[in-house]
Amino acid sequence: MAKKKKQNNPNSIAQNKKARFDYFIEETFEAGLALEGWEVKSLRQGKVQINESYILLKNNEAWLFGALITPLITASTHSNHDPLRLRKLLMHRREIDRLMGLVDQKGFTVVPLGLHWSKGKVKISIGLAKGKKLHDKRATQKERDWNRDKQRIMKYHA
C-alpha cells in the first residue's frame, strides 16, 4: 500500500509552485471563496488543482478562473457539477479597488498562490505579481541550485 504524501502545513490544501517560479510576488492577500457544498467536500479530500488558474478583476469583483475541483464519486448525481466553474473571491472593496488600480497602471497581474483552511473556512492566498523574463528564471534557478549545494557541503564537512 502506498504511503500518503506528507504535507508541511496541515491547513494547506493546494499550492501553486509554478506561480513563484514564473512571477515576482510583490504583495500577498488573503480572500475567501464562494463555494458549493460538493466543492468543500472535494477540497477536504485534496482533489483540487490551481496550477493553471488565474484571477480576473471585473466589474469591481474578483473571480477565480481555471481552478479544477474534481467532484467526488459519491457526490449527488441529480445536480450538474462543473469542475471548472468560475468562483467568486470574497474581498473588501478597497482591496479590490487597489488591486484593479495596480493591475491597470503598472503592469501587475494577480495570481493564486495557494488554498488553505482558516477557522473552518477555505481561504485563497493571492499575490500581486510581475512576470519574470527568461534570464530572471535562470538566475532564480541558479541561486536555488547554489543554496542546495551549499547545504550539502555544510552537511558533509561540518
From Swiss-Prot:
Any GO molecular function: RNA binding
Key words, A-Z: Cytoplasm, RNA-binding
GO biological process, one term: trans-translation
The keyword Cytoplasm appears for this protein: yes
InterPro entries according to UniProt: SmpB, SsrA-bd_prot, SsrA-bd_prot_CS
Alphabetical list of Pfam families matching this protein: SmpB
First-listed, main subcellular location of the protein, grouped into a coarse class: cytoplasm
Compartments, record wording: Cytoplasm
GO cellular component: cytosol
Top-level taxonomic group: Bacteria
Annotated function: Required for rescue of stalled ribosomes mediated by trans-translation. Binds to transfer-messenger RNA (tmRNA), required for stable association of tmRNA with ribosomes. tmRNA and SmpB together mimic tRNA shape, replacing the anticodon stem-loop with SmpB. tmRNA is encoded by the ssrA gene; the 2 termini fold to resemble tRNA(Ala) and it encodes a 'tag peptide', a short internal open reading frame. During trans-translation Ala-aminoacylated tmRNA acts like a tRNA, entering the A-site of stalled ribosomes, displacing the stalled mRNA.
Family, similarity comment: Belongs to the SmpB family.
NCBIfam families in alphabetical order: PRK05422.1, smpB
Protein name: SsrA-binding protein
Organism per entry: Hydrogenovibrio crunogenus (strain DSM 25203 / XCL-2) (Thiomicrospira crunogena)
